[in-house]
Amino acid sequence: MRVFSSIDELRHTLDALKRQGRNVGLVPTMGYLHAGHMELVARARAENDIVVVSIFVNPLQFGPAEDLSKYPRDLERDAAMLKQAGVNFLFAPGVGDMYPRPMKTVVDIPDLGRELEGAVRPGHFAGVATVVSKLFNIVQPQTAYFGEKDYQQVVIIKRMVEDLAVPVRVISVPTVRDADGLALSSRNVYLSLEERRAAVIVPQTLDEAERLIGDGLTDAKTLEAKLTEFLGREPLARPEVVAVRDATTLEPVTSIGGSVVVALFVRVGSTRLLDNRVIGDNRTIGGRNQPGKGVTK
């Protein structure tokens, strides 16, 4: 596995391989890899000749009071995991490599990016869309892989690709979970033992949503209220977003029919946990790009 920090050097290497007819898959990450990331890598390895994994903690997607400075980092560990997994190239630029001058250009999807998680993290999704757009321009992959834990992010990136006619197929991969159902996340390392035990309320709330819908509940506002009440059983959990949306568009729904996504954004202690579940048939995340095959694994 070769490691790059230079945009020009990576481009030069990939251009030569593409001229040989090799197709390229990209897995964008912020590092501190876990089994969920490695599932993305495995999917990319199975479907592409060349796999590029990027590790970049993107300052544009962090608010001023968020955890940019303490976000977990261990590039040596990550590189060893990726090498063992058969990744061809690791792109690990510094901030100066990605943003040599202050950014004057921003990619924004105003409606989608200001809803749900975007409502409590202003500017977050503009930062995500901007860095992903730049990574797509640098690597120019045929396919790119994202985890469904970040469901809203997948919808936004697919919409960006469609609106801007970016020739990249966006593939979403099911969420990987611990044995008790908690979605794997690099930020789980922040949880104390007590908070980690409390965090199981998040996947349990998704189970409760599925049960309530299965029992015939169809009013979205009633479901949101019941799920908020359910989360309140755990004193360490503070719900910030409890929402039922159309699974394809993320538009609000009043009546539950077809496919909906139940989206949760819950603070446990000082750590924000993000999770979701799609309930219903015929799911298509964000439109035309190819979705994953499920939500849990």
UniProtKB/Swiss-Prot annotation:
Q: Any miscellaneous information on file?
A: The reaction proceeds by a bi uni uni bi ping pong mechanism.
One GO cellular component, as annotated: cytosol
Identify the enzyme class: ligase
What terms describe the molecular function in GO for this protein? ATP binding; pantoate-beta-alanine ligase activity
Q: Which protein is depicted?
A: Pantothenate synthetase
CDD domains assigned: PanC (cd00560)
The compartments listed are:
Cytoplasm
Top-down, what is the taxonomic lineage of the species of origin? Bacteria, Pseudomonadati, Pseudomonadota, Alphaproteobacteria, Hyphomicrobiales
Q: Name the gene that codes for it.
A: panC
Q: What is its EC number?
A: 6.3.2.1
Record keywords, A-Z: ATP-binding, Cytoplasm, Ligase, Nucleotide-binding, Pantothenate biosynthesis, Plasmid
Catalyzed reactions per annotation: (R)-pantoate + beta-alanine + ATP = (R)-pantothenate + AMP + diphosphate + H(+)
Residues holding (R)-pantoate: 61, 153
